[in-house]
Every structure is written in C-alpha cells, then in structure tokens.
Amino acid sequence: MADDSALHKKYPFLNLLHTPPHRPPPLCPQAPRKTQCKRRLGNEHEESNSPLATPCVWPTLDPWTVETTTSSLTITTSTKDGTTVTVQLRL
C-alpha cells in the first residue's frame, strides 16, 4: 500500500474523508402566533340591530358615487374647486 501522504497529494479529496461533519445551522426563531380573528360577513352586520360604534358622517354638500366589483371598491367625489377625487380599494 502506498504512503498516505502521497495518496493525499495525488488525490486531495481524500482529505475530506477525515474532516469532522459540519454542524447544522442554527434554527431561525419562530414567528409569533397569529391571533385568531373572526371574520364578519357583510350580511352579519345587516342582521345585527346595534348601531355602528362611530357613525359615518361626511361633512360635504357634494355627493359621492360608490362603485363595487367582486374585487374592488371605488369612491368618487368632487371638491369645492372642481377637483375630482377618486379612491379605489382593491381586495
């Protein structure tokens, strides 16, 4: 059998056989648990007779339009100087 150092010079990957195994990386900290929230459906609010906690009051004389689709809500109004303001919420 040939000398080990000669083998290691000829085949350097043999050195890998004698290296200690790598330690696994430390685990990432877990994310905090998400609190459970009850989703209310739109018709649940209509069935309850209790008023809203904060009444919705819009201090303007100009009317606004509300358009809805299955995935968005668009509210449009005009300011006193004629600027059109559009707010779109995409779900």
UniProtKB/Swiss-Prot annotation:
Keywords, in A-Z order: Early protein, Host cytoplasm, Host G2/M cell cycle arrest by virus, Host nucleus, Host-virus interaction, Modulation of host cell cycle by virus, Phosphoprotein
CC terms in the record's Gene Ontology section: host cell cytoplasm; host cell nucleus
Function: Associates with keratin intermediate filaments in certain epithelial cells in culture.
Main location: host cell
Keyword NAD carried by entry: no
Region named Disordered: 15-54
Name by which UniProt lists this protein: Protein E4
Annotated source species: Human papillomavirus type 6b
Assembly notes: Assembles into oligomeric complexes. Interacts with host CDK1. Interacts with host SRPK1; this interaction may favor expression of late viral transcripts. Interacts with host cytokeratin components KRT8 and KRT18.
InterPro entries, per the entry: Papilloma_E4
Gene Ontology process terms (BP): symbiont-mediated arrest of host cell cycle during G2/M transition
Note: The major E4 form is first synthesized as an E1^E4 fusion protein from spliced E1^E4 transcripts, such that the first few amino acids of the E4 protein are derived from the N terminus of E1.
